[in-house]
Amino acid sequence: MAKQTWKPGNMLYPLPAVMVSVTDGEGNDNIITVAWAGTVCTNPPMVSISVRPTRFSYDMICKTKEFVLNLTTEELAYATDYCGVRSGREVDKFQELHLTKEKADHVKAPMIGEAPVN
């Protein structure tokens, strides 16, 4: 078989959707759903996510250089979908979805209390 060149894209399926919580450090927090997330290193712990520059959360991440990955459950399916299709420019997703902000140990971005793993 001859080699093929494919356009950039996601070739590893399935990828879990994760909810990423962010802050701008000035009292504004947001949640974005991403499907492109992965482990980069375990020591020190590092993960990667892919966020388009046009997304509301992008500038927050660039400004603070931090975020929290929040794993989802079946119970969080609606919230996970909602956070992927609604912009934080228009709605406070924590308030709208009645999600609990919890203080993280090492970053300023809040954790989602309902997520089983942050």
Task: Label the predicted regions.
Residues M1-V34, G38-N118:
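Active-site-proximal mixed secondary-structure blocks
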